[in-house]
Amino acid sequence: MKYVFIEKHQAEFSIKAMCRVLRVARSGWYTWCQRRTRISTRQQFRQHCDSVVLAAFTRSKQRYGAPRLTDELRAQGYPFNVKTVAASLRRQGLRAKASRKFSPVSYRAHGLPVSENLLEQDFYASGPNQKWAGDITYLRTDEGWLYLAVVIDLWSRAVIGWSMSPRMTAQLACDALQMALWRRKRPRNVIVHTDRGGQYCSADYQAQLKRHNLRGSMSAKGCCYDNACVESFFHSLKVECIHGEHFISREIMRATVFNYIECDYNRWRRHSWCGGLSPEQFENKNLA
């Protein structure tokens, strides 16, 4: 093309001379140059979108995929839809942290009495302190395992109680429940659902339930779906801040888990159950 030739040789010959020899109008040449350098409206939008999505993705510590990023950006006033955000992530080669397979904690037969399943996989609660759920998971460090027990309010999915220990004991479960009771100002008649682990069937834990007029409930044997909400939290914890990291000590793991629960998950991590709000935002909105 003549304009391409002129562009390639403009350092050697004058524009005027080349236009005359090639019989093209100089105005046509300059119009072509302007069109080449002008960014289309669509390109401008994509560049703006990519910049905004990258910033939000970075703030989420690479934890959010397209749906949660869309909620986050809409809350900031950007009218993007999920397809637009997903396309931006693909263009930039960005992917949220992915899960990996792990084996759940196995429990030995203990012969202790178990409670009836009062929940029956009905995780809906119309208000706070109606249904709580608890469980224990383990976290690997160079010093050995660190066990984490949590209590979640199924109304908002907030982690209201937690405890960590190098040993998986009944006291670990009791401490997590005690924190939940303290935070929620000791409500009564709450259904507290757990699995059938020895820590939850222990005399100490059962006495704590009875002392505070709480209603114990336990999953069916070997059915992880009966406590799916807590399993989902553990999955998020491990995918978003544990997997891919190396923890040389239990103390570093403690600090990481504390920060995730209290600073990230409860306060600002957007939850689909809460309509795209964080558990804390959901509670503040509905208790105002």
Swiss-Prot record:
It holds the Pfam family rve_2. PROSITE patterns: INTEGRASE. It comes from Escherichia coli (strain K12). One of its GO terms (biological process) is transposition. Residues 124-287 form the Integrase catalytic domain. Keywords: DNA recombination, DNA-binding, Transposable element, Transposition. Involved in the transposition of the insertion sequence IS3. Disulfide bonds: none annotated. One of its GO terms (molecular function) is DNA binding. InterPro entries: HTH-like_dom, Integrase_cat-core, RNaseH-like_sf, RNaseH_sf, Transpos_IS3, Transposase_IS3/IS150/IS904. SUPFAM superfamilies: Ribonuclease H-like. The keyword DNA-binding applies. Belongs to the transposase IS3/IS150/IS904 family. This is Transposase InsF for insertion sequence IS3A. Gene3D superfamilies: Ribonuclease H-like superfamily/Ribonuclease H (3.30.420.10).
